[in-house]
Regions:
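Active-site recognition of the HExxH zinc-binding catalytic motif
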Residues: 127, 257-278, 299, 304, ...
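Active-site-adjacent "gating/activation" loops or surface patches in catalytic cores
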Residues: 65-83, 191-267, 271-276
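C-terminal, non-catalytic "cap/extension" segments appended to globular domains
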Residues: 17-28, 46, 140, 169-179, ...
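Short, glycine/acidic-rich hinge or "gate" loops at secondary-structure transitions
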Residues: 118-125, 166-180, 215-221, 282-288, ...
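Post-HExxH zinc-binding segment in Zn-dependent metallohydrolases
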Residues: 290-319, 327-329, 333, 407
């Protein structure tokens, strides 16, 4: 049984939360999954199913596109119109979607409040004080992780306000609205990167990760070894992802087409692949599958080191600006925006826990206040900006969104450490990857030098954002 000690220890840690057989049967029939040995979000509740059905059944308005054609919006096409170069198209798209959500706001409020009530009821049934405590405890996490994330990001909102002002200047706008936040600020990083060049640059960029990481990465990036399904072909799904099962090497599925974005995605997906591979090499089956909280750490660290590598080697100011703007957008959307989502989620659960009735007005007002606070005085609120919560499925996923923000913040902090400290930091990072699920996630992350119960790692990501802002502003002034 020794090889299964971590798994059994984790079960024992939560044994006090088990109810009697009859009570367990009842809560299982009602859909409780706090004890399920699968991802919490693989079991949708009836509230989540109803939310999905409502989104599917909605008829979205038509708008006039940049060519003057009448086009019907869908949730699939909405992001494209939201970032249109034509400001009127963007305004129409956001207004149409948020206006439609507002028309059905009481139904959306009912599905979300029902989900949150379930979260709270299941937590209380097992003796937890809050739903946050219950759903983090499944992975052995302290609620201080979420509190620290929200507090640290709130302490640095002045940087996001600077970014909004910068975006307004770059776009020549007197007022910045929600429909102005998604327009690309540059044409993107224009690089033609055939796979052999991408392989070489990724290996060179990730050299600070240490010899072990390099050896496995080189093996995986060699197509002859069977890790990669590299190029698009008929009947192949779009996008990119990494997949693994215990035993053989992981697989990385790409649709590589020789662009910078493809190279960055390749580095990202190999972060997932190497995490899984190193954990499988070091751990038995019961302890190799790392939790979602750690899933984006290696992937984002890879992306940061690749970005640093390219910035250090480019003399092209347009390319440099594009790389820097991309970094700003990654931190804005993944740390600032996902933290705003996490704060909304915590606030709404708090309403239920204190007995406050959840209404559409309360949800809209709460979200609107967050948008105003996060984006600051340079941002102009529109009538239905408080409705964005209504179509975001992650609010049904039981404290999930925060891990996007902590993952990127951890990746930035680890990239900083291996760049500055070299081999000792690389060894600590590799130790974390090899750990799989053999220790509590926070303990594993501390091996890599990151403690998310304290502000340091999150502050590092804020300083990266600030430094990048400074450089973009300087480039504009020249």
């Amino acid at each position: 049984l020794e090889v299964h000690r971590p798994y059994l220890t984790n079960l024992r840690r939560r044994s006090s939360r088990l109810l009697g057989p009859e009570a367990e049967r009842v809560v299982a029939l009602l859909g409780d999954n706090l004890w399920a040995e699968i991802d919490l979000n693989e079991i949708p509740s009836t509230h989540e199913d109803t939310f999905g059905a409502l989104l599917t059944d909605l008829t979205w308005p038509t708008i006039t596109d940049a060519e003057g054609r009448q086009v019907e919006l869908t949730l699939a096409s909405y992001p494209r119109y939201r970032q249109s170069p034509d400001r009127d198209v963007r305004r129409q798209a956001v207004g149409a979607v948020f206006g439609t959500l507002h028309d059905f706001r009481n139904t959306f409020a009912s599905t979300l409040s029902g989900q949150v009530q379930l979260d709270v009821d299941y937590a209380r049934a097992r003796g937890y004080r809050t739903a946050l405590e219950a759903y983090l405890d499944k992975d052995g996490l302290d609620t201080a992780v979420v509190s620290n994330l929200i507090d640290t990001v709130n302490a640095n909102l002045g940087l996001l306000h600077r970014y909004v002002a910068l975006r307004g200047r770059l776009m020549g706008l007197d007022e910045v609205h929600l429909y102005d936040l998604y327009v690309p600020l540059s044409e993107g990083v224009e690089m033609e990167v055939p796979f052999p060049d991408a392989r070489r640059m990724i290996l060179e960029a990730l050299a600070p990760m240490g010899e072990t990481y390099q050896q496995v990465l080189a093996e995986g990036l060699d197509p002859r070894n069977g890790w990669i399904d590299l190029y698009p072909h008929r009947d192949k799904d779009s996008g990119a992802f990494s997949s693994s099962v215990y035993g053989p090497h992981p697989w990385v599925f790409m649709n590589y087409q020789d662009t910078y974005d493809d190279m960055s995605t390749l580095a990202h997906e190999f972060g997932h692949a190497l995490h899984s591979h190193l954990a499988m090499q070091a751990q038995p089956y019961s302890s190799f599958r790392y939790v979602m909280f750690l899933a984006e750490v290696a992937s984002t660290a890879n992306e940061m080191l690749l970005s640093d590598y390219l910035l250090a080697r480019t003399d092209d100011e347009a390319q440099r600006a594009a790389l820097l703007v991309e970094r700003l957008e990654a931190i804005r959307t993944t740390i600032f925006r996902q933290t705003m989502f996490a704060e909304f989620e915590r606030t709404v659960h708090g309403f239920v826990e204190e007995g406050t009735p959840i209404t559409a007005d309360l949800l809209e007002e709460t979200y609107r206040d967050l948008v105003s606070r996060y984006y600051g005085p340079g941002y102009t609120l529109d009538e239905h900006d408080g409705m964005e919560w209504a179509y975001i499925p992650h609010f049904y996923y039981k404290y999930y969104v925060y891990s996007y923000a902590t993952g990127l913040a951890s990746g930035i902090a680890i990239a900083d450490r291996v760049r500055e400290l070299g081999e000792p930091a690389a060894q600590g990072f590799t130790s974390m990857l090899r750990g799989g699920a053999s220790a509590p996630p926070l303990e594993l992350l501390r091996r890599a030098g990151v403690d998310l119960t304290k502000p340091d790692a999150l502050e590092a990501s804020m300083r990266t954002f600030e430094k990048t802002l400074d450089e973009v502003e300087q480039l504009l002034a020249e």
